[in-house]
Amino acid sequence: MLTYAQAGVDEEKTAKALRAIIDAARRTFKFRMNKIGEPGDIGHYSALLDFKDFYLAITTDGVGTKILVAEAVNKFDTIGIDMIAMNVNDLICVGAEPVALVDYLAVKEPNEDVFQQIAKGLYEGAKEAGIAIVGGETAVMPDLINGYDLAGTAVGIVEKDKVVTGEKIKPDDIVIGISSSGIHSNGLTLARKLLIPKYGLDYEYNGKKLWEWLLEPTRIYVKPILKLINEVEVHGLAHITGGGLLNLKRLTKYGFELEMPPIDGIFKLIYENGVPLEEMFRVFNMGVGFMVIVPQEEKENALQILNKYYESFELGKVIKEPEKIKVKNYGITL
């Protein structure tokens, strides 16, 4: 049995340590009070800055330890997609259209071939997301870093009457799940430490090598979500990343009653190697990379739109019971 904390990522410890930084950040809000760019609160997927007629949304994220798998097999051509995805999927959670991104690449030493591979993924990700990469920073730090780290900061725009924060969510709203492409870019530390020592990266599982399962690019949900919010009343949007289903708690005080898909693919291999069921749903997306909350009368319209892009399905509903996430078909509550 192995948990995320035992693998080295203790989220409770991290949250506790972050309090000082978050408190300091909130104290800086006064520097923009009653000025262009006055910020809202911290805690949603993207921060919203007030620009009178619209909000500027801003977020930052990285690839994480997925890049260690890329380094191990010398295949870096998709991690740029992951970095773009992790940022733009957070922007659309507030209804924002992604506009621009700057990247941050830290390396021990520059490698032209690796940089070309990363650039390929960045371009493909930007193309799918409809975003411009307008700058960045490459830091060569042989005394500090061993290998590579890739992150980015993205901005988007949303009209004030189109912003989605979750405040409209109410009991009996319908939760729709959009399928993931696999593990995406979260929980890789746990997956790597659990599976690679036992099987090796070339282990064949259900027709693919382990490294292929781990490097499958994160799905980009920009096109279906922007289409959806222009045609359907949407009450909430959730990118299922670090924290798994707990991400739903960012949106509302209400709880959720869900039936999740069968455990399959890379998640089945991880689960069969001893990760507790509750931990699986706290760490991984479990086959659902994005969730949409809509009123009951919009369910069919939403499903029709979303299924034109990726497999989408009704997962359950919002319940009055506060802050409980019940996964009925697995008998767990988070």
UniProtKB/Swiss-Prot annotation:
GO BP annotations, alphabetical order: 'de novo' IMP biosynthetic process; adenine biosynthetic process
Q: What's the chief localization of this chain? A: cytoplasm
Q: Which reaction does it catalyse?
A: 2-formamido-N(1)-(5-O-phospho-beta-D-ribosyl)acetamidine + ATP = 5-amino-1-(5-phospho-beta-D-ribosyl)imidazole + ADP + phosphate + H(+)
Which of UniProt's keywords are assigned here?
A: ATP-binding, Cytoplasm, Ligase, Nucleotide-binding, Purine biosynthesis
List the GO terms this entry assigns under cellular component, sorted alphabetically.
Answer: cytosol
Location of this chain's protein in the cell: Cytoplasm
Pathway given in the UniProt record: Purine metabolism; IMP biosynthesis via de novo pathway; 5-amino-1-(5-phospho-D-ribosyl)imidazole from N(2)-formyl-N(1)-(5-phospho-D-ribosyl)glycinamide: step 2/2
- Would you identify the family this protein belongs to, as annotated? Belongs to the AIR synthase family.
**UniProt cross-references to HAMAP family, sorted A to Z:** AIRS
Q: What PANTHER family has UniProt attached to this entry?
A: TRIFUNCTIONAL PURINE BIOSYNTHETIC PROTEIN ADENOSINE-3, TRIFUNCTIONAL PURINE BIOSYNTHETIC PROTEIN ADENOSINE-3-RELATED
Protein name per UniProt:
Phosphoribosylformylglycinamidine cyclo-ligase
